[in-house]
Amino acid sequence: MVVPFKNEPGIDFSVQTNVERFNEELRKVKAQLGQDIPLVINGEKLTKTDTFNSVNPANTSQLIAKVSKATQDDIEKAFESANHAYQSWKKWSHKDRAELLLRVAAIIRRRKEEISAIMVYEAGKPWDEAVGDAAEGIDFIEYYARSMMELADGKPVLDREGEHNRYFYKPIGTGVTIPPWNFPFAIMAGTTLAPVVAGNTVLLKPAEDTVLTAYKLMEILEEAGLPQGVVNFVPGDPKEIGDYLVDHKDTHFVTFTGSRATGTRIYERSAVVQEGQQFLKRVIAEMGGKDAIVVDNNVDTDLAAEAIVTSAFGFSGQKCSACSRAIVHQDVHDEILEKAIQLTQKLTLGNTEENTFMGPVINQKQFDKIKNYIEIGKKEGKLETGGGTDDSTGYFIEPTIFSGLQSADRIMQEEIFGPVVGFIKVKDFDEAIEVANDTDYGLTGAVITNHREHWIKAVNEFDVGNLYLNRGCTAAVVGYHPFGGFKMSGTDAKTGSPDYLLNFLEQKVVSEMF
């Protein structure tokens, strides 16, 4: 009997023994860094001469892993492997596939601290964020395993005299998973194993910055007994293999989390029917946001300031749900801005090995992009705090607040994906909602208000996929807050929802006359 779903707990680092144990795990992981990461195709580990490096963004001289690069020939072999494995994997019962995923989750639970420690080094994640990432990966796997069991018998439809009808679900084939670097375990594991538990096979192209983290999942899948070829591991240069994976005639679906530019490119290319392709491809895309916290008058200003700061600067603003815009009623704007500045100036920034609140941004490209937006912000508004940058040893950017901005300003319209938040002063709640919707994106949002009628207005008019009342706009929890957005934030395929597996299933109807 499968026990009811329960979210995986984090680790309480206010307890000294937990701190000591995690420090020991960091030492163990650090001693093993620099290893070679192979491709994995049909269960075979392939080490290539053409490689790239994964480095610690907090200490760029520290090699995390030397990664083999997949070629287009390797991708062809991976598709052959996945297509072959699909013929038997799709015949596994729903229950057997789900139980295998539960074994995977149990192994991850046993290795949670190891996986978390790897993310501290490879992704520059603070301790709590790293542990939360690993725990969320467990949650996704546990949740999807149970979801598959619930879908096993299909859904009831009507019979009539002399006719029995069945409506049930079947897998669709081989697909491609392209996960992001910012949740290198949780999103990677969830978007890989959701289609797998549904009976499909996958080519997993991990994010280049966090390959070691993704490779740990491959080790765990092998230990759990996943058949060879069900998941094939193909790290590589997106410019060399990205389009090839998406365009391939055997790609039935692409699940992608990342930038708007890449997501729309995938969507466009997936619409082209290739020679020999007998189906329409599905795209499941999450492409970021320009998320806002709206603050009404007559609110708890301490709560509002804390919600803005934690949502803006957690994991250095490198969350698609991060608060990038603070839209504040004129009656409380100055007070909340001042409190937010004070809270921000207390945040610690540094190498997350030392358990700082904030660590580096992920790579040089992101560092340069964010630094450029800070310069733009200085021209468009007033720099209130932060703005400093340092890439001498790692990619560090101070938590930065701008005020005096207008909705049309670039730093209020374009996704920065870093520790930068802009304040806009509005005259009333109607204007606040108007400004909040003045964006191409619609992922998350929050409203701080004590006016029930204003909250109802936000529910009906604030055009985001995930809306929160009197809290920040980050930290969706699997099973409680299915996650996905509107507009240019993606296809709104809510992860961690009862409907998510339907993205990887076809519905079949069988009518039997008697």
Swiss-Prot record:
Pfam families: Aldedh. GO terms for molecular function: 1-pyrroline-5-carboxylate dehydrogenase activity. It catalyses: L-glutamate 5-semialdehyde + NAD(+) + H2O = L-glutamate + NADH + 2 H(+). It is an enzyme of class 1 (oxidoreductase). InterPro entries: Ald_DH/histidinol_DH (IPR016161), Ald_DH_C (IPR016163), Ald_DH_CS_CYS (IPR016160), Ald_DH_CS_GLU (IPR029510), Ald_DH_N (IPR016162), Aldehyde_DH_dom (IPR015590), Proline_metab_enzyme (IPR050485), RocA (IPR005932). It comes from the Bacteria. Signal peptide: none annotated. HAMAP family: RocA. This is 1-pyrroline-5-carboxylate dehydrogenase. It comes from Staphylococcus epidermidis (strain ATCC 35984 / DSM 28319 / BCRC 17069 / CCUG 31568 / BM 3577 / RP62A).
